[in-house]
Every structure is written in C-alpha cells, then in structure tokens.
C-alpha cells in the first residue's frame, strides 16, 4: 500500500474512534506517520507515492491500538507547544492549546510593564513538563524564569526539556509550591 493510501485509511480510523474532525484526525495520523517514518511533514508528503513497509505498517497499527485508550502525546512521548517540541510522559499533564494564549498575554503584559533592559521575573509554579516557563524563556531571553515543582517524576521531565532548550535564564527548584521562595518577589 502506498503511504498516501495508508494515511487516508488511518485518518478515517482515527476519526472513528476519537470523534475528532476529519482535519484533526488527519493531523494526528500525519504525526503518527512522521514519528514512525522519522520524517518531518514536507518529507512525509514527498514520500506519498512510496510503499509503506509491512514493518512500518505494523508500528502504525500498534500506535493506533494504544491510541484508543491513551493520548497520542503520551504514546509518542512528545508534544508541540507554542511551535516548540517538548518531551512528555504520563507523569505530567499535556499542555493545552489554550495555554498558548496565556503565554501571549504574559508576554504582552510584560512588554508593557518592563523595558527591554529591565529584568522581568516569571514564576511557573507546578511546572510539570516546564513547557510554559521554557516557552516564556525562549520568547524573552532577557527575563529570568523560575520553574517550581514538587514531584520528582515531573522534575525529571522538566530537566529533560531544560536540556533540550539550552537556556541559561531558567532555574528549576523542587519545592512544595511557594514555601522556599516566600521572601522573593516575582512579576508574573
């Protein structure tokens, strides 16, 4: 079977068991194919006329079987948030799309309140994967970002994402919410 035919077939399959729109199902199926074939979207499209190997077809079917009971981000161990890819596992929550608008608002408010040369300090309490704080740090490298998390499993996920982002304006602290930082001040 050609990759394009398989993609259409599995898009319908995703649509049936997730109750997503056809567009959402196609995007999800494309993510599965990109993961299995280890390609980006343009490369996937270039390969539409290639034959899908039995091995890769089986891998796709295995992922789809898991997908019946588990979000795709947990299966693939990654999630795109605000144009960046983050490591995710079931020890942290999957970032929601509407959280991206919070990022936009924090940046907008921060830009209004602080000049370029001033340092803004952003606290991400209960950071989980760290995607919110890391995204802020990526968008505003002149700001200081503090990630706060209590659970060691989530801290491990945040550490992986910190290594991937390679920013020096972020600190990660294991803490029971605000106890050790009570005497500090934060802008957001």
Describe each region flagged by the PLM.
Residues 1-17, 108-119, 182-183:
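Short, Lys/Arg-enriched, disordered terminal segments
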Residues 179-188:
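A short acidic, Gly/Pro-enriched loop at the edge of an enzyme's catalytic core
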Residues 1-79:
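N-terminal auxiliary segments of SAM/dcSAM-dependent transferases
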Residues 158-170:
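Short, conserved SAM-binding/catalytic segment
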Residues 35, 39, 109, 139, ...:
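Active-site catalytic microenvironments for nucleophilic, acid-base chemistry
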Residues 27, 168, 184:
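Structured loop/turn residues at beta-strand edges in well-structured enzyme cores
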Residues 59-140, 145-160, 174, 179:
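SAM-dependent Rossmann-like transferase core, predominantly class I methyltransferases
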């Amino acid at each position: 079977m050609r990759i394009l035919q398989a993609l259409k077939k599995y898009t319908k399959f995703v649509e049936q068991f997730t109750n997503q729109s056809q567009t959402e199902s196609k995007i999800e199926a494309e993510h599965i194919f990109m993961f299995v074939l280890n390609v980006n979207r343009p490369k996937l499209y270039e390969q539409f006329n290639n034959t899908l190997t039995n091995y890769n077809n089986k891998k796709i079917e295995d992922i789809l079987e898991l997908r019946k009971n588990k979000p795709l981000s947990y299966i693939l161990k990654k999630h795109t948030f605000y144009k960046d890819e983050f490591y995710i596992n079931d020890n942290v929550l999957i970032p929601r799309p509407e959280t991206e608008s919070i990022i936009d608002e924090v940046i907008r408010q921060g830009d209004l309140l602080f000049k370029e040369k001033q340092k803004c300090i952003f606290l991400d309490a209960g950071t989980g994967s760290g995607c919110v704080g890391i995204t802020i740090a990526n968008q505003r490298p002149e700001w200081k970002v503090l990630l706060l998390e209590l659970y060691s499993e989530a801290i491990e996920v945040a550490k992986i994402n910190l290594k991937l982002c390679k920013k020096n304006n972020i600190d990660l602290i294991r803490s029971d919410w605000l106890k050790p930082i009570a005497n500090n001040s934060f802008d957001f």
